[in-house]
Regions:
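N-terminal positively charged helical leader segments and presequences
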Residues: 5, 10-102, 153
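RNA substrate-binding interface of SAM-dependent RNA methyltransferases
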Residues: 25-26, 102-199
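Non-catalytic positions within long, well-ordered alpha-helices that form the structural scaffold/packing
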Residues: 61, 131-134, 238
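Short acidic/polar active-site loop segments enriched in Thr and Asp
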Residues: 66, 136, 243
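Short, acidic/turn-prone active-site loops that include or flank metal/cofactor-
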Residues: 101, 226-227, 249-252
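Active-site/ligand-binding-proximal alpha/beta "capping" segment
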Residues: 198-234, 243-246
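Structured adenosyl-cofactor binding patch, chiefly the S-adenosyl-L-methionine
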Residues: 231-273
């Protein structure tokens, strides 16, 4: 009974949609994953005690862990650690490190999502799902028709919020390297930093997305806001070497376009098969 409640709590906490077989002995239960803001020791000596800090301790309390449960820790530097929970207090928890696994689950195709600011709920969705799909970087940009206006302290707080979403998405999907969520820039600021191949999704473009990229090189994918890019913005982007490309015959919403394009690139050139 306790095992059933434990698995249900993990599923709810991490918003998982598992295969029903995970509830039976056919498939082993995956231990819950937590991001450690504190660097984990390398090399890992089995039996080493490690203090996981307040954030992880709070999660363990919410899940009603009492000690003895096995969890997975990662710190963003690659690989993951199996650990056994030993002591939990209100502001801290101690685990015993069991072993280090150098496993990586990064996509073979490197994609930077350059996303024009959208409404708050849409941005949260875009950040979460793009991390799950395998992007390596996310660059939020302010554009003429963006509905979300951010500057100064509001922008800094929102970026911290997005970074927390990226961490939570990595905990859920199994990634051991957290994608970089950059600070908010204007379109022109971002264009000045353009290096390598960059593609702007534009319904009226002549070339297709898949026919415009070299998947062996990093790709920057530029997605417009709810109202789209202005003609002046597209002209400036093209002048900086950005390639307009179409993605199917339909005009997609800003929260759909980037995610669908990332999934298509991952299916054709990456590991989404």
């Amino acid at each position: 009974m306790r095992g059933d409640l434990y698995r249900a709590a993990i599923i709810l906490h991490h918003e998982l949609v598992p295969n029903p077989a995970t509830f039976f002995s056919i498939t082993p239960v995956i231990s819950p994953r937590f991001f450690s803001a504190l660097p984990l020791p390398r090399p890992c000596t089995p039996g080493t005690a490690f203090n996981v800090g307040e954030a992880v301790a709070r999660h363990l309390q919410v899940l009603r862990f009492a000690g003895g449960e096995v969890i997975t820790l990662f710190d963003g530097a690659g690989g993951e650690f199996s650990a056994t929970v030993e002591n939990i207090s209100k502001r801290d928890a101690t685990v015993k490190l069991n072993r280090f696994d150098p496993v990586e689950r990064e996509a073979p195709i490197r994609i930077t999502l350059v996303q024009a600011l959208a409404t708050a709920d849409k941005m949260d969705l875009i950040i979460q799902k793009s991390v799950e799909l395998g992007v390596t970087d996310i660059a939020p940009i302010a554009t003429a028709r963006a509905t979300l206006k951010l500057d100064g302290e509001r922008a800094e707080k929102r970026v911290l919020h997005w970074r927390a979403i990226a961490v939570a998405a990595c905990e859920q999907c199994g990634r051991n390297r957290v994608p970089v969520v950059h600070g908010v820039q204007t379109l022109d600021q971002w264009l000045k930093s353009v290096r390598g191949q960059s593609v702007l999704l534009q319904p009226l473009a002549e070339k297709s997305l898949l026919g415009s990229v070299d998947a062996t090189k990093p790709i920057a994918l530029l997605i417009g806001p709810e109202g789209g890019f202005t003609s002046e913005e597209i002209t400036r982007a093209v002048a900086h070497g950005v390639i307009p490309a179409k993605f199917g015959p339909r005009t997609l919403r800003t929260e759909t376009a980037g995610l669908a394009a990332i999934a298509a690139l991952g299916a054709c050139f990456g590991d989404l098969v």
